[in-house]
UniProtKB/Swiss-Prot annotation:
The family this protein is said to belong to: Belongs to the class-I aminoacyl-tRNA synthetase family. Glutamate--tRNA ligase type 1 subfamily.
GO cellular component: cytosol
Example GO molecular function: zinc ion binding
GO biological process: glutamyl-tRNA aminoacylation
Protein's UniProt name: Glutamate--tRNA ligase
Length: 478
């Protein structure tokens, strides 16, 4: 049985790079009928926070990513938080110490700094000298007597580590490049490269799918697998995600967390769809794909090794397609209501639904509701200096609004058809047409030079509010 995992640290919001890693693990698991595990890497006790863990899970679920085993779901390989697994890790540390594959290192920070400076002066990469590698019992006793808190280092064998990466192909790294590395810090906390091996081995992980920034960690982890006699999983290192300027994706590229995209009014299915295309592409030339279509076509072997480019304009376009064409109106309205309410636009469900029907073709994110929907909710809007000057300089503007008002003032309701018929009457009787007819009505009803169709607007807001806006305009400029 194939088993994969996503193992984030709860030290902040879910970054889009990590979300893409979670997504590709999820897609692999569903395509391969494998088990998907969520594991929380919270050994950084200072930075890890419970609220970040909760938000992380919320954001994954919002995206449509579900897991089979995890802190909330349970499972046969728990606990699924590293902070709850310390006893397990120390058992394997003891095993390595007893087998001679690990040792206590008493070197001070000053000594290590001198080693680093010497390496720099000699123009070579730094690796630990191995000073404490073969201490005698007497030497150890001497250091213990000085109350020096040791770290524990892994005794790295002198060899070339070779593995076949599913995405990157053949990889060879000489262990001379990194030397004996720390597996337990002075405070007694085991480090990432050690605990990740123990967790992956005991949880039966068969495929490790993660970002290429972990590529340099892989040989260190492989030598630990070998020392403990664990089966080595297959590795797949995903390409880095860059901004449009070809630098590493960061806050200066705008919203780069799932939470920020959600708050900015992006649709979860659009985010799922877009992130799936960062480094992978279906065989067919089609970009709008349902979750089921993506799962069916996704193969980890097809992931590209060159960097993926995060194109916000394309994400907005794709989000707009979901708003305009894919979500049904009721579903879209339910998702939009928190945005309406957040902007102070209060109404009942049916009114929200009518507004969404009117504006969905002109927005790319739900955040744009603030501006696009304003004309449906705000009756007392300011007249800009431009409008004031226009009305003063062209008497026809006021005249057209007055004619239109006289045509509708006795109506008890108004529909799109009524609006079209009335404007046709005005054209016929007074000769006003095109911009000369519709522009004055628009600025009287909205205070804007362009926007939503006027026939739609009058039908949605209703006759009383149409009269109120026209009367307000006529009184202001009369």
């Amino acid at each position: 049985m194939k088993r994969v995992r996503f193992a984030p640290s709860p030290t902040g919001y879910l970054h889009l790079g990590n979300a893409r890693t979670a997504l590709f693990n999820y897609l692999f698991s569903r395509h391969e009928n494998a088990t998907f595990i969520l594991r929380i890497e919270d050994t950084d006790l200072e930075r890890s926070k419970k609220e970040y863990e909760e938000m992380l899970m919320e954001d994954l679920k919002w995206m449509g990513i579900e897991w089979d085993e995890g802190p909330d779901a349970g499972g046969p390989h728990g606990p699924y938080r590293q902070s709850e697994r310390l006893e397990i890790y120390m058992k394997y540390v003891d095993k390595l110490l007893k087998s001679g594959d690990a040792y206590y290192c008493y070197c001070t920070e000053e000594e290590l700094e001198q080693e680093r400076e010497k390496a720099i002066a000699e123009g070579r990469p730094y690796r630990y000298s191995g000073k404490c590698r073969n201490l005698t019992p007497e030497e150890r006793a001497f250091y213990e007597g000085k109350s020096i808190k040791p770290v524990i280092r892994f005794k790295v064998p002198d060899k070339t580590v070779v593995f076949e990466d599913i995405i990157r192909g053949h990889v060879e790294i000489d262990t001379k490049e990194f030397g004996d590395f720390v597996i337990v810090r002075q405070d007694g906390m085991p480090v990432y490269n050690f605990v990740v091996v123990i967790d992956d081995a005991l949880m039966g992980i068969t495929h490790v799918i993660r970002g290429e920034d972990h590529l340099s960690n892989t040989p260190k982890q492989i030598v630990i697998y070998e020392a403990l006699g664990f089966a080595i999983p297959q590795f797949a290192h995903l390409p880095i995600i860059l901004g449009e300027d070809r630098t590493k994706l960061s806050k200066r590229h705008g919203a780069v967390s799932v939470r920020a995209l959600k708050d900015d009014g992006f649709i979860s299915e659009a985010v799922f769809n877009y992130l799936s295309l960062l480094g992978w592409h279906p065989k067919e030339e089609k970009e709008i794909l349902s979750k089921e279509e993506i799962i069916k076509q996704f193969r980890i072997e097809d992931v590209n090794k060159s960097p993926a480019i995060f194109d916000r304009t394309k994400l907005r376009w794709m989000n707009g397609v979901y708003i305009r064409e894919i979500l049904d109106l009721d579903d879209l309205t339910k998702r939009a209501i928190p945005f309406f309410e957040g902007f102070g636009y209060k109404a009942d469900y049916e009114f929200y639904k009518k507004v969404m029907s009117a504006i969905r073709d002109s927005i790319e994110t739900l955040m744009e509701i603030k501006e696009r929907a304003k004309v449906f909710f705000v009756d007392e809007f300011p007249y800009t200096e431009e409008i004031v000057n226009e009305v003063k300089s062209d008497e026809n503007v006021y005249k057209v609004v007055e004619i239109f008002y006289n045509k509708i003032k006795n109506l008890s309701a108004i529909t799109k058809e009524d609006f079209k018929n009335i404007t046709k009457e005005i054209q016929k009787e007074y000769g006003y047409k095109g911009k000369a007819l519709f522009h004055p009505i628009r600025i009287a009803l909205t205070g804007e030079p362009s926007g939503v169709g006027l026939d739609l607007l009058v039908e949605v807001i209703g006759i009383e509010r149409v009269k109120f806006r026209l009367e307000r305009f006529l009184e202001y400029f009369g």
